[in-house]
UniProtKB/Swiss-Prot annotation:
It comes from Homo sapiens. One of its GO terms (molecular function) is protein kinase binding. Transmembrane segments: none annotated. InterPro entries: Kinase-like_dom_sf, Prot_kinase_dom, Tribbles/Ser_Thr_kinase_40. This is Tribbles homolog 3. The gene is TRIB3.
Amino acid sequence: MRATPLAAPAGSLSRKKRLELDDNLDTERPVQKRARSGPQPRLPPCLLPLSPPTAPDRATAVATASRLGPYVLLEPEEGGRAYQALHCPTGTEYTCKVYPVQEALAVLEPYARLPPHKHVARPTEVLAGTQLLYAFFTRTHGDMHSLVRSRHRIPEPEAAVLFRQMATALAHCHQHGLVLRDLKLCRFVFADRERKKLVLENLEDSCVLTGPDDSLWDKHACPAYVGPEILSSRASYSGKAADVWSLGVALFTMLAGHYPFQDSEPVLLFGKIRRGAYALPAGLSAPARCLVRCLLRREPAERLTATGILLHPWLRQDPMPLAPTRSHLWEAAQVVPDGLGLDEAREEEGDREVVLYG
């Protein structure tokens, strides 16, 4: 006999509350019931359909899924920690992330620190059992990494619109004492099917600062996005400046279709990063080249701040030139520094252009 969907609890969103469950879901993570069959080929994540399953498949999934208050958990998503979820009273789709309840404070602290922002994802509801924590997020429609992988290069006008949203999200985090540490393209996801609006997700691993000092000691970063100061022997580094470097890698990848630093051998890859050895692709406008160089500076103190990025001419909505001011940020935005190691990069890579994942 099918269970009757429970009514959604009244109250504001993004709140934590104790569950009233029909079944004990705290003993283990939800398990999806599957028919026994032979191995099935799996598509890579970028080729999976963005639209929801057809009605018959969804009905079958709901009938066999795990019940969680007014929600049912459906198929697990890539990585195993998140599940597709359906809010029964409204039929709205969500992504449910599951954590041990002991991690509740660490998981929710970054979201509690940040005021709501249109370009930063936050849980719409949090349910807590005795052993597991369930955070529900609005479903998204692909990410920037998949977009670059499928299109190779993003035209400058479109890239500027998307990158402004990315920089806005980072500036919001930095202004409220949050360092992302592991910033990369796949953390920026599309909130709409038209792929026009980006939001930053996965703040759970961010570092919440307790004061103005943003010094970090851990070496937490994706190899392709890691800053040279993290690879050095320095005891600490600026977390915010490291985020800006990673954002510069993301911008370069959007415009070029490949990472600025590439090598199959990690030692050689890290050597290129330490030297700042990259070559800008041909055809970029002068403002775009300027912004990339202002972000991928070997010295952290020479990079633009996240707020300063938004003042750069490449991201200005007004195409008319502005009168120069004495603002430090404006002066920094106007500087077009010579990239360190550019000649080395040209000698090493020549004219070849390696496409992402190709």
